[in-house]
Amino acid sequence: MEALLAVEETGNDLWKELKELYWAQYVQNSVDKVQFERYVRKVKSADDYWLVRALLAFSDSRKACTFNSRFEWLTMQAHGRQYPPLASKDAGKLIWNARREFRYAEPQQAAYKQLARPRGDAVADIQQHPDLGNCSMVCALINVKRTCGTADMVADCGDVAQVNLFFNGARRLVTLHRAEVRQNMRREQLAVLSPDMHDKLIEQAYFEVAHGMNYESMGSNTAMDTYMLCGWFPLVVETSEVDFPFVQRYLARGAMLALGTHATRTIDSFCLRKNHDYAVLDVCGTVFRIRDPLVAGNVIELAWEDVRTAFHLLYINWDAHTQCQLYEKFHFRYNSAVHNRFMSWLNKPTYRVVNDTESELPVYALFERHLSNRKYDNSIVGVISGENLVSDTEEGNNIGMQWVELTVPPHSSRILFYHSNTNTNCTLHLFSNSPRLKVAKWSSAESSRLAVLDGCWQPISKNLTFTHWPAFKFEIKHPETDGVHVSLQFCWANEHSAALFIYHASDYRYEKPLLHRPGPLPFPQAFFELALDTNTPYVVLCQSMDVGADAAFQLAIQTEKQGSVISTVPTSRAYGGLRFHTSKLVSTAAKRIELPFKVSRSTDLHITLYSKSSPLVLKCAVFSDGSDEAITATPGFVPINDYPYVLPITFAKERSLVLLIELQDTVPDSTVTIEIGSNCAFNFCGHDVDLARV
């Protein structure tokens, strides 16, 4: 203890300074060159082997500083303590966290004080301490020591022990302030029972990271704890859902296995504990040799069919490096405010895997959610063929690790997406065997065959519902084909129903929708498919059934035809989408109404009539001032109601124009709304003229 205080309080300013250099390099992103060179001279004169080794490791890592390495330093915190991505063998006496006492449950604390339950080291093999609920960690430790050893996990340097565990996307360093666990006067300890002190140090590091220095553990699962110890891929499946060939496939890869019983029941004939994990020592034929971590030397042998009956969960860990030569990892931040706006994979973090070879290639991908105080949050990983709007597969769980094994055909691609129900940092670990298999973050903007349109609804007047819903004009261009199959995905971010319409852009009255699902869409996501002509403009209208809606929506348009290019532009049904517009409310007390107006130059005209107050029958026409020939007109008398009537769109060459309205019958207490859109500025001239009074 005295030696440790010397390290922390007086002596090792050089170690503290090295820690500050790490912090400046990776967190603050600025290292003073003069300060660093001065520090190197100090280390040379100190003649400390461990310090020199730690400095060399720092210099090497600085030369290879990448986005990944910086991200791993920026995400080194868990439970308020720091765990840098350093190897235990290179860390020396670097102390990253202040001393803090572990917390014990009341029964554990009472047992410790009474000296009744702590155990000594008189055991031949690793055993779970009966007062600690860490069967999963002990099973993991049994399997890891037996399969790949723990020599590289722990390094002793004087009064400091350094332990490597895998979490938060990297192999990370846990500094223990004493190379021993807490003991009573008899040198008995409340820890894993083992003749190897390194096992106790590994367990202490595990409880610090996984449970925030709290020995009152409710357990985890062996697959996750095995990953934390050695970094092997974790997989958790229900025994009832897999067959023995499935198990054999992983055994052939050298996998470690463990089994978990039901939380509520066990089969009495097998004498197993409820809600407890067991290590699988080996499998001979179809017979599993199983060990209870609480009891050393007691091996249970069960055939596969009995295993399926007696156990609920099968835990698998396997080393992907044995199957693949190439490894990449990608760190990203999952922001639920951004990525959970809509029920669509197009809003999720996505990575594209491209196979540019003549043969199909296997790919193994693991998405690792970083540690947080929130447990049992759901995560989902999906696979997309090409750029389809519907995923091929989606798998999810709540353990924080989700992995997928896929095969990418020759000259093809697959897209991986990740979903979480909360904010988190995440890491994608990806293994493959070909340097020609390329992986990169993907965005829908990279595709010419996929258009993603974002918009929003805002509260509007009931008088404007038809014309003021958001709309987009789009066209699918292709040099060779006349028609394509089109898929659409429509998502919105409120609980109200919605509707989607598609029209030919030439259908200026919007009378013949090519797509209009009968009735409103009740769910905040809908898919459609239809055939459209290429090189032909269309208009799509996104409607909310609630005029007071204040919410975002997203529309995706996709075609599988190679060589297609989708172009889009926002438009509006109001005023024909033209730049200049005005509306005028006119009384229908007179039978004939003349509205003169002027335009600044020759222009397109889009004229809409509707009446919210009462149905009307009228005819309407536009003339050049002084001319008897109509530029555009209704085909005689037409009914006008709350569904707008659009006059044929026309081009007016003259600047002085007159809009003439003639009613079949006057309606004194009613009005008609006139909306005019044009390409240039215009204005009505003077007062309305009632021709019936002239």
Swiss-Prot record:
Keyword list, A-Z: Hydrolase, Protease, Thiol protease
EC number: 3.4.22.-
Any one GO molecular function term: cysteine-type endopeptidase activity
Domain Calpain catalytic, chain residue ranges per copy: 80-320
Domain of life (superkingdom): Eukaryota
Catalytic machinery residues: 135, 276
InterPro entries membership: PalB/RIM13_Calpain-like, Papain-like_cys_pep_sf
The UniProt record lists the keyword Transmembrane helix: no
Enzyme class: hydrolase
GO BP annotations, alphabetical order: proteolysis
Function in brief: Required for the proteolytic cleavage of the transcription factor RIM101 in response to alkaline ambient pH.
Family under the similarity heading: Belongs to the peptidase C2 family. PalB/RIM13 subfamily.
Full protein name: Calpain-like protease palB/RIM13
Organism: Eremothecium gossypii (strain ATCC 10895 / CBS 109.51 / FGSC 9923 / NRRL Y-1056) (Yeast)
Lineage, broadest ranks: Eukaryota, Fungi, Dikarya, Ascomycota, Saccharomycotina
